[in-house]
Amino acid sequence: GVHAIEQSAHFDTKKKISNKSNLIKSLNFFLNKKSISIKGLKKKTLNFHARYSAKKRIYIYLIRNHISPSVININREWHIINNLDLKILKKGASKYIGTHDFSTYRASNCNSKSAVRTISKVSVSKSKNLIIITFESKSFIKSQVRSMVGCLKYLGEKKWTIKKFVEVFKSKKRINCAPLAPAHALYLKKIIY
């Protein structure tokens, strides 16, 4: 599934927390069999909500673009053998920036009232054989990032032209979307409050 490098949660308590360090150690003791660890605690106001108070979320998607997969990062990157054109990927990714109706990328079981979202930044970079696609927005609809990456893959492989890519985006019809990119290569990198 999707990974989180940095995630936030909140809880209400009437009890005074006098030693944050001890609480972190205790929580991590009970979580030691899970793929999760508590890094820190911060006191917040009563109206704070870990999900709804977020100003920005940053996701990254990792693509291993090489003939051979990375054995160490299996189930952590999407291994794509076909060469992806980085210049075309960047051009396509730039089309996502701004306020748009992202209905094309919306999961059929999405409960969001609206598919209109504002993406403040999308970047595509490459280091050796690893392509990193970064998305920044206040919020995303269900499956949006994975759907957008799936469409970028088609574009990068030259299965689609930039014209076709934009037509699919503007169609607002899920049926026109490329297949979803796998969840195992998607990471919630950071939440900004």
Identify what each model region corresponds to:
Residues G1-Y193:
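Structured-RNA-binding interfaces characteristic of tRNA pseudouridine synthases
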